[in-house]
From Swiss-Prot:
GO MF terms, alphabetically ordered: electron transfer activity; heme binding; iron ion binding
Record-given protein name: Cytochrome c-551
Keyword line: Electron transport, Heme, Iron, Metal-binding, Transport
Binding site for heme c: C14, C17, H18, M55
Protein origin, superkingdom: Bacteria
């Protein structure tokens, strides 16, 4: 499920930065952190695949379907 992918997915895991806001990563349960981010899952997946700021590109390293599940989980906390 999305939460398990968020915690245990492709390294570096989503949780390693988004749990604590490392390097400007928007945190879970913090809608204000996400205000200037794309709101659609597709846009966030594309951003994740390409990499953004300190976040490395996950293209070729993570399954797109897994990214969708992890991002849907993250958005569900807002």
């Amino acid at each position: 499920d999305g939460e398990s992918i968020y915690i245990n997915g492709t390294a570096p895991t989503c949780s390693s930065c988004h749990d604590r806001g490392v390097a400007g990563a928007p945190e879970l349960n913090a809608p204000e952190d996400w205000a200037d981010r794309p709101s659609s899952v597709d846009e966030l997946v594309e951003s994740t695949l390409a990499g953004k700021g300190a976040m490395p590109a996950y293209d070729g390293r993570a399954d797109r379907e897994d990214l969708v599940k992890a991002i849907e989980y993250m958005l569900s906390t807002l």
